[in-house]
Amino acid sequence: MSLVTSLTYVLPHRLLSSLARALAYSDRPATKQWLIDTVTRKFGVDLSEAQEPDPRAYPTFNAFFTRALKHGARVPDADPAALLMPADGRISQLGPIENGRIFQAKGQSFTAAELLGDAGAAAPFNNGLFATVYLSPKDYHRVHMPWTGTLRTTVHVPGRLFSVGPDAVRNVPRLFARNERLVCHFDTDFGPMASVMVGALLVSGVETVWSGVEIPRYGDRITRKDYRGKGIVLEKFAEMARFNYGSTVIVLLPPGVATLDGGLGAETSVRLGQALARRQLG
C-alpha cells in the first residue's frame, strides 16, 4: 500500500473535498488558470476534442473539468444490440456477479447489496454482469447511458471519500461499497439496470441531468428519491450525469440479457460509446 493510500485512512476527507470544491468553483483568474494549466500538464489533457479548445476560455476549473466534447468526437457503436461504455476511462474490473459479490481486485470484493445500499434492489442482479470504469483526471467527465432507460429511483448512500486510484482499489477493502455514492436505477426493455456514481477524495460533486447536484450531501442516512411516474426517459448514449472531478462509475446488468464484449479486461482503456456488452436477442 502506498503512503498516499495509507494517509487517506486518517485524512479529513470531507474537509479536503470541501476545499477542493471551493477551488474548483473559484473564478479568480490566477487560481483557476493555475489549476487548469497544472492538471493539463501533469495528466496530459487533450483539449483538441473539446467543444472549447482554449484553456483560458473556461470561467472556472470546474467548467474546464466538466467540458463538453465536440460533436462527433464520440460515436456509439453501430450495432443496435450493443450496450455502450458509459464513459471514457479505464476498466478497473468487469465480469459476472457471482453469489451476489462484485470483484474489486485480487483478494478484494464486496456485495451488490452493500454497493446499492439495499439487498432487495441487488437481488435482480445476482448472476448478472458488472463493469467498473475509472475516470482519471485527464478523461472526459460526463457519464452517458449504456442503453435506453426510464429513471425509477435514486439512492444516495453516505460514506467515506477514499481515493479510487489503482493503489486504493488494490488495498482498501470494499472500497466502492464504503465511499459515498449515488445509485441510479433504471427500467429498460430487458429489465432493471443500475449505474452507480462513486465519489472519491477531492471529488467536489456529482450532478445528474434530471436533478442537478446530488453529491455532496451531508448526513449519515441513506436517502431515496422515487421518480416513478415522472416520465424521465434517457436514450441510449445520452448524457446522464457528470463528475466534478475524477472518479468511478459501476454498471450492473441482470442475468441472461447480454454478454461482455470481447477484448475487454482489467486495465483496458475505453472510450465512451464503444460496446461494453451485446444483447442476447432472440
Swiss-Prot record:
EC primary class: lyase
Active-site residues, record numbering mapped to chain: 88, 144, 247
Record keywords: Cell membrane, Decarboxylase, Lipid biosynthesis, Lipid metabolism, Lyase, Membrane, Phospholipid biosynthesis, Phospholipid metabolism, Pyruvate, Zymogen
Entry membrane topology: Peripheral membrane protein
PTM (free text): Is synthesized initially as an inactive proenzyme. Formation of the active enzyme involves a self-maturation process in which the active site pyruvoyl group is generated from an internal serine residue via an autocatalytic post-translational modification. Two non-identical subunits are generated from the proenzyme in this reaction, and the pyruvate is formed at the N-terminus of the alpha chain, which is derived from the carboxyl end of the proenzyme.
GO CC terms of this entry: plasma membrane
Modified residues (Pyruvic acid (Ser)): 247
Keyword Protein transport attached: no
UniProt pathway: Phospholipid metabolism; phosphatidylethanolamine biosynthesis; phosphatidylethanolamine from CDP-diacylglycerol: step 2/2
GO MF, one example: phosphatidylserine decarboxylase activity
Cleavage (non-hydrolytic) (site feature) positions: 246-247
Cofactor note: Binds 1 pyruvoyl group covalently per subunit.
Top-level taxon of the source organism: Bacteria
GO biological process: one example: phosphatidylethanolamine biosynthetic process
Reactions accelerated catalytically: a 1,2-diacyl-sn-glycero-3-phospho-L-serine + H(+) = a 1,2-diacyl-sn-glycero-3-phosphoethanolamine + CO2
Cellular compartments annotated: Cell membrane
Chief place where the protein resides: membrane
Reported cofactor(s): pyruvate
Matches recorded under InterPro entries: PS_Dcarbxylase, PSD-B, PSD_type1_pro
Family: Belongs to the phosphatidylserine decarboxylase family. PSD-B subfamily. Prokaryotic type I sub-subfamily.
Function, in words: Catalyzes the formation of phosphatidylethanolamine (PtdEtn) from phosphatidylserine (PtdSer).
Quaternary organization: Heterodimer of a large membrane-associated beta subunit and a small pyruvoyl-containing alpha subunit.
NCBIfam families on file: PS_decarb
Protein name: Phosphatidylserine decarboxylase proenzyme
Gene source species: Xanthomonas oryzae pv. oryzae (strain MAFF 311018)
